[in-house]
């Protein structure tokens, strides 16, 4: 009996979530919304594919934007 050859899975290189020119800032609402769930929760570092430093900066920026009422704390639109 012949064995089937093992196929290698090609790993697609994913693009970084934040482009080199983008700055994480509480005023950049389009960028902040990409890292929030539909319910308004901050997504984890593993899901976002951010570095630890970027995740900390993103969390602080989202919290500042929430306090200034630029983005809602919860998104309960049903």
From Swiss-Prot:
Q: Does the keyword Ribonucleoprotein apply?
A: yes
Q: Which GO terms describe its biological process?
A: translation
Does the keyword RNA-binding feature in the UniProt annotation?
yes
Q: Name one GO cellular component term.
A: mitochondrial small ribosomal subunit
UniProt superkingdom: Eukaryota
The coiled-coil segments of this chain are: none
Q: Any idea which GO molecular function terms this record carries?
A: small ribosomal subunit rRNA binding; structural constituent of ribosome
Compartment annotation: Plastid, Chloroplast
Q: Which UniProt keywords apply?
A: Chloroplast, Plastid, Ribonucleoprotein, Ribosomal protein, RNA-binding, rRNA-binding
What InterPro entries would the database entry show? Ribosomal_bS18, Ribosomal_bS18_CS, Ribosomal_bS18_sf
Residue ranges, compositional bias (Basic residues): 1-16
**Region listing for Disordered, in residue ranges:** 1-20
Share what the entry says about its subunit structure, partners included: Part of the 30S ribosomal subunit.
HAMAP family linked: Ribosomal_bS18
Family membership: Belongs to the bacterial ribosomal protein bS18 family.
Name the chain's protein. Answer: Small ribosomal subunit protein bS18c
Species the sequence originates in: Chara vulgaris
Gene (name only): rps18
């Amino acid at each position: 009996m012949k064995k089937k050859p093992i196929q290698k899975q090609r790993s697609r290189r994913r693009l970084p979530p934040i482009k080199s020119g983008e700055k994480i800032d509480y005023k950049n609402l389009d960028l902040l919304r990409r890292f929030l769930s539909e319910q308004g929760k901050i997504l984890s570092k593993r899901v976002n594919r951010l570095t630890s430093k970027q995740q900390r900066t993103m969390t602080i920026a989202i919290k500042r934007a929430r306090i200034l009422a630029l983005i809602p704390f919860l998104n309960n639109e049903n």
